[in-house]
């Protein structure tokens, strides 16, 4: 038999339980000692001669601190400098070099890196290889004892003055360099003005071409800019192997990593510039020589006289081919658009948007004394081999705007700014100054704020840090105007090895 169990009645209080605030106010909560102050915890940061701190430190990398210039950076620049990062005591730069910031070794530390980079780089400068190009031009015209004409060609290097220019001004300076070489060399050895065999232009010389007469019937080439162009005579060529000016012209290789970039006259097959129709002879041929009277209404049906223009008003030859339909001049733009697309110049060159910056490259950030070396880099103490911890594009951008009156402004400036030096042969339809483009492009330096994410920190860093910014060729960049970095350390995880 089961024994009966007597249940006792439990009395509940009639009042509700005390509030949370009342209970917490009755006695202070117990706090373990390790939370009373910053001690040697896994997230502690210790400065020399100071007690451990929480991970609230920020490290500022400043390129132009006045206290660092005389003792640390007198021989440095804004892309390769030393800076003191210990700010909690009045240390001199020499004393700061003996101080350290120690992170708890039981944790893996990382630093959130944010940088500000400002440059003042012009688009045409020797540092970025945008001041020079080579061209093969005629340097002498001689006659031997038998009366035969001997033409001599040589490769010459042309140098542009450094500066920040628009696309139109860059083309004008390239043409001016060709003319100055002719005046200095070619003219002294019998070379004619019509023998100037390298010209940079912007027109489409095929506009107005009549398929019946095979001539440009308006008698002039359309004075409208379409795309930068290269015009060559036989024996001439342009070499952009060691120059980035081809990027400004918008003419690039389809295989950009292959060595060499030479455009010769022979490459421009199918790009001959058509000859101009002699409009004056054509109109004169249609005029009636007889007087039309009311009794007979006699009028002769004369045949139109279709002939090309052979020389300009100054007597310079247009270098016509024997067929009298085309000139010897060949245009890269015509060969690219109207030539053979499989075997012509279109098969290995590419028409691109002109990059007035010359092709801005990337820059690399190196913090060799602060960040751990990435596994893909070997530790080095040479500037050109510093391990890279961050990368970004050079803060140089091309800015474009539309100017419908570009050619009108160009004509006005010839009188006001005296830019007629760029238009030495206004009577010649080939050698005339190329028209300005309606889409004007300029190079602009825009400050860049970049968040590079979290990078692994060393467990101990020096009070003086080196900051290096190198370009794509691992050279320090003299055009860096301002470089600023902010590093925020934080614990990533516990150290497991």
UniProtKB/Swiss-Prot annotation:
GO terms for biological process: clathrin-dependent endocytosis of virus by host cell; virion attachment to host cell. Coiled coil: none annotated. Gene3D superfamilies: adenovirus 2 penton base, domain 2 (3.90.1620.10), Penton protein, domain 1 (2.60.120.550). A motif (Cell attachment site) lies at residues 293-295. Induction: Expressed in the late phase of the viral replicative cycle. It is found in: Virion; Host nucleus. One of its GO terms (cellular component) is host cell nucleus. Keywords: Capsid protein, Clathrin-mediated endocytosis of virus by host, Host nucleus, Host-virus interaction, Late protein, T=25 icosahedral capsid protein, Viral attachment to host cell, Viral penetration into host cytoplasm, Virion, Virus endocytosis by host, Virus entry into host cell. GO terms for molecular function: structural molecule activity. Major capsid protein that self-associates to form penton base pentamers, each in the shape of a pentagon, situated at the 12 vertices of the pseudo T=25 capsid. Involved in virus secondary attachment to host cell after initial attachment by the fiber protein. Binds host integrin heterodimer ITGAV-ITGB5 (alphaV-beta5) thereby triggering clathrin-mediated endocytosis of virions. Mediates initial virus attachment to CXADR-negative cells. Binding to integrins ITGAV-ITGB5 also seems to induce macropinocytosis uptake of the virus. Belongs to the adenoviridae penton family. Interacts (via the cell attachment site RGD) with host heterodimer ITGAV-ITGB5; this interaction promotes virus internalization. Interacts with host WWP1 and WWP2. Interacts with the fiber protein (via N-terminal tail region). Interacts with the capsid vertex protein; this interaction binds the penton base to neighboring peripentonal hexons. The cell attachment RGD motif is exposed at the virion surface and is involved in binding to the integrin heterodimer ITGAV-ITGB5. All late proteins expressed from the major late promoter are produced by alternative splicing and alternative polyadenylation of the same gene giving rise to non-overlapping ORFs. A leader sequence is present in the N-terminus of all these mRNAs and is recognized by the viral shutoff protein to provide expression although conventional translation via ribosome scanning from the cap has been shut off in the host cell. This is Penton protein. The lineage of its organism: Viruses, Varidnaviria, Bamfordvirae, Preplasmiviricota, Tectiliviricetes. The gene is L2.
């Amino acid at each position: 038999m089961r024994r009966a169990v007597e249940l006792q009645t439990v009395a509940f209080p009639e009042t509700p339980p005390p509030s949370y605030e009342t209970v917490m106010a009755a006695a202070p909560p117990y706090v373990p000692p390790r939370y009373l102050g910053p001690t040697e915890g896994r997230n502690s940061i210790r400065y020399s001669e100071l007690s451990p701190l929480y991970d609230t430190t920020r490290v500022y990398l400043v390129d132009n601190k006045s206290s660092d210039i005389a003792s640390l950076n007198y021989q440095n620049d804004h892309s390769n400098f030393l800076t003191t990062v210990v700010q909690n005591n009045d240390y001199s730069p020499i004393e700061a070099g003996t101080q350290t910031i120690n992170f708890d070794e039981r944790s893996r530390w990382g630093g959130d890196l944010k940088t500000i980079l400002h440059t003042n780089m012009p688009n045409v400068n020797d540092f970025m290889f945008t001041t020079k190009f080579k061209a093969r031009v005629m340097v002498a015209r001689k006659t031997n004892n038998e009366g035969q004409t001997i033409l001599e060609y040589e490769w010459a290097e042309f140098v542009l003055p450094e500066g920040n220019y628009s696309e139109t001004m860059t083309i004008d300076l390239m043409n001016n360099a060709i003319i100055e070489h002719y005046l200095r060399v070619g003219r002294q050895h019998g070379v004619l003005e019509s023998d100037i065999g390298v010209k940079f232009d912007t027109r489409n010389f095929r506009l107005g071409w009549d398929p019946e007469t095979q001539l440009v019937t308006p008698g002039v080439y359309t004075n409208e800019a379409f795309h930068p162009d290269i015009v060559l005579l036989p024996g001439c060529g342009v070499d952009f192997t060691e120059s980035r000016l081809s990027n400004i012209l918008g003419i690039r290789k389809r295989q950009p990593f292959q060595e060499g970039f030479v455009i010769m006259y022979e490459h421009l097959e199918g790009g001959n510039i058509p000859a101009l129709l002699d409009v004056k002879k054509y109109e004169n041929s249609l005029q009636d020589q007889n007087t039309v009277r009311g009794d007979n209404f006699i009028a002769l049906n004369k045949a139109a006289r279709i002939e090309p223009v052979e020389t300009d008003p100054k007597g310079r030859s247009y270098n016509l081919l024997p067929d009298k339909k085309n000139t010897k001049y060949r245009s890269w733009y015509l060969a690219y658009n109207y030539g053979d697309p499989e075997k012509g110049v279109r098969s290995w060159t590419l028409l691109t948007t002109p990059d007035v910056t010359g092709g801005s490259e990337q820059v690399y950030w190196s913090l060799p004394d602060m960040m751990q070396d990435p596994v893909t880099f070997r530790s080095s103490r040479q500037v050109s081999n510093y391990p890279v911890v961050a990368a970004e594009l050079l803060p140089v951008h091309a800015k474009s705007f539309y100017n419908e009156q570009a050619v009108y402004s160009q004509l006005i400036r010839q009188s006001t700014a005296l830019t007629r030096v760029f238009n030495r042969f206004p009577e010649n339809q080939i050698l005339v100054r190329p028209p300005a483009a309606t889409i004007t492009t300029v190079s602009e330096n825009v400050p860049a704020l970049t968040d590079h994410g979290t990078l692994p920190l060393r467990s101990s860093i020096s009070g003086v840090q080196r900051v290096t910014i190198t370009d794509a060729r691992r050279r320090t960049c003299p055009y860096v105007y301002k470089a600023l970095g902010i590093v925020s350390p934080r614990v990533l995880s516990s150290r497991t090895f």
